[in-house]
C-alpha cells in the first residue's frame, strides 16, 4: 500500500489515537491529519520538554484530549462524544527502566489501560477497527541469530515487556469473546525500536 492509498482510505474517517502526544503517536496523528481524517487524540500531557506534539503543529488541527487510559469513565465519555470508526491504541508506559521503578503503574497502564480501551470498543458499535500497538519485546529472548516470527512464544520477563505480552493476551481474549462475528476487526502489531526527529525521550537509541 502506497501513501496515496493510505490517504484515500483515511480521508474523512473518524480516528481515535491513544498516546497521541508521544513520539509515535504524534507522527501518526500528523499523517492522519494530512490524510484528511477527523482525528481525536487521547493521552497524557506531552512526556518531554520540548515536545514533538507542539513542534509538529498539531494543536488546533485535531481534537486533543488530555486524559489517562486508566480512567474508564472518562474514556467512555470520549467514545460516546467522538464516535470513532477506527481506534489506534499506542498509549503506554513505554520505558523498560521505568517499569522496574514502578511496576504497578506499568501494569495498570499497559494491561488495564488496554482493557479499558477494548471495553469502550465493545460498547460502541461505531468502531469498525481496533489496532493495539505493542512491541517486539513481547517474545521470549532465545538469544538466537535470526529474527523472531509472529508465532514464536510470548515471554517478556521485565515488567514493561511482560505487561505488553499481557496486553496482547487481553486483546486476543476480547477478539475471541466479543468480536468473533467480525463486526469490528481486532488486531495487534509489534513495533521495534524507532528513530526520528523529535524523539526527546530517555533511553532512546538515537535521541534528538
Task: Identify the residue ranges that each predicted region occupies.
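N-terminal Rossmann-like NAD(P)+-binding domain of SDR-like oxidoreductases, especially those catalyzing
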Residues: 1-191
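Glycine/proline-rich active-site loop of Rossmann-fold NAD(P)-dependent oxidoreductases
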Residues: 124, 165, 182, 195-208
Amino acid at each position: 500500500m502506497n501513501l496515496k492509498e493510505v490517504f484515500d482510505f483515511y480521508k474523512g474517517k473518524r480516528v481515535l489515537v491513544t498516546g497521541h502526544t508521544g513520539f509515535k503517536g504524534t507522527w501518526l496523528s500528523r499523517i492522519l491529519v494530512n490524510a484528511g481524517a477527523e482525528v481525536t487524540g487521547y493521552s497524557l500531557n506531552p512526556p518531554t520538554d520540548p515536545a514533538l506534539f507542539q513542534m509538529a503543529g498539531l494543536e488546533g488541527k485535531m481534537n486533543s484530549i488530555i486524559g489517562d487510559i486508566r480512567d474508564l469513565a472518562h474514556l467512555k465519555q470520549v467514545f460516546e462524544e467522538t464516535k470513532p470508526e477506527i481506534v489506534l491504541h499506542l498509549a503506554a508506559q513505554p520505558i523498560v527502566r521505568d517499569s522496574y521503578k514502578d511496576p504497578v503503574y506499568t501494569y495498570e497502564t499497559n494491561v488495564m489501560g488496554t482493557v479499558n480501551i477494548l471495553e469502550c470498543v465493545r460498547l460502541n458499535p461505531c468502531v469498525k477497527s481496533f489496532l493495539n500497538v505493542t512491541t517486539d519485546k513481547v517474545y521470549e529472548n532465545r538469544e538466537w541469530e535470526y529474527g523472531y516470527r509472529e508465532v514464536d512464544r510470548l515471554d517478556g520477563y521485565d515488567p514493561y515487556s511482560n505487561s505488553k505480552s499481557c496486553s496482547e493476551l487481553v486483546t486476543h481474549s476480547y477478539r475471541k469473546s466479543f468480536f468473533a462475528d467480525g463486526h469490528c476487526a481486532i488486531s495487534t502489531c509489534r513495533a521495534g525500536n524507532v528513530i526520528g526527529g523529535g524523539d526527546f525521550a530517555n533511553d532512546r537509541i538515537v535521541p534528538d
